[in-house]
Amino acid sequence: VDYIIIASLLAVLSWSFVDAVSKLYINRFGKELSSMILLAIGIIPMLLLATAYPYLGNILFLLFIGLVGGLVLFLGYILVYKSVPSGGVSNSYILLEVQPIILILFGIFVLGEHIGMEKAASIILIFIGISLILLSKKFKLDKRLVPALIGNVMWAVYWAIIILAFLYYKNFVLPLLFVRVFGAFFAYLYYKAKPPKNYYKINLSKLEISIIAILILAGLFDGFGNILFAFVSFSNKVVFGSAILSLDPIIIWLIGLIAYHEKITVRQKFGFLVATTGYLLFTLL
């Protein structure tokens, strides 16, 4: 279990870095170009890892999983990145709590993993916390955060699809690689579908180069995080790994407040505390 904990925590740290710096490159390059570069760069660590694993055949299966999973993965990035500039880092990424909840339920009802009543109660607390974050001052749904919510559901679906692919293929590296390649391809098509006049023209100033470097580093960390969580999932520890994964949005929520000075309502603060309490109960009980 120790290596599962280490792998899960390293995945959290990797994704926390990506999420924390995402506002910098999204504001600079836009969601289309940012998604394309991030997905493409993330292929590199997966490709390096794939060289150490044998090819098990069944190319049609890999292409099918790549097509379906890649589309869902791409849609997750575009939708979440649409919310970040207006909804803020804190509130957009606290909705990442949706992912582990869905994956925990997936692990229980589909993969046959088990949790106790205490953990089930903590999941309900996380749901309540997320609901409070999504509501505006007048108890209406904050429309700025709807894309982020849907995007995080998409990411959870992506993981559900690819975990089933791991179990069928008896290997997690090649399905992960194929999905990433197709995701980058869809991001490229989406970017090229824009009118040429709307393409971002990169100006190689010192600021521009630094943000490009951050984006490239984020892509590498994102790919690394995917490899780590894929390994955890392939080890039949989806529920356990997903519970630790819940720490990521809590870290990002605090970074958004401290580093970006984002403003949130009292209700959203309370929602954060409720969701965090649910996470702590899940991991400690």
Task: Name what the model sees in each region.
Residues V1-L71, Y77-G87, S136-L149, Y168, ...:
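Membrane-interface interhelical linkers
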